[in-house]
Amino acid sequence: MYRWAGLFGIVCLVFSLQMMIARASAHAAPAAAQSSGAASASSDAPALDYDFFKTRVEPIFLKKRPTHARCYVCHEGASHALNLAKLDAGNANWTEEESRRNFDTVSQLVNPGDPLGSTLLRHPLAPEAGGDAFHSGGRQFGSQTDPDWKTLADWVRGQKAK
């Protein structure tokens, strides 16, 4: 039993390091592009739309998925890279301020224009569908054709709210 506990601890450590590296890369890339003064591919990246996020992406975090917990259950006020605002008791949705905070937090896990280059989409996706194997919440999305995965990908590609 102790061997499994040690293995689990190592997996958690590796995952934490990956998330820290992803977060640092997300923060460093824009700063490097700005300081170099050179045009970069990121300048051509689509802007992430807050209204699309609020109306189409946030509900996915609250949605119960078959055989899985809601994203929110593990990621509210957590120390994960995906750290969603905690809902007040009795509230089914976030306030405007909380949604703005969620938008800022979740945007750090996105490489605009590149769904598979975005931790937000790659991490909960099944490895055989292009995801990674480190999501402790399981395979939230079995394929890139999952309607919710496609909605997240649309947002990352710059889809605007209608």
What are these regions (language model features)?
Residues 21-162:
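Aromatic- and Gly/Pro-enriched helix-to-coil junctions and flexible linker segments
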Residues 7-19:
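Bacterial N-terminal signal peptides
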Residues 1-4:
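Positively charged n-region of N-terminal signal peptides that target proteins for export
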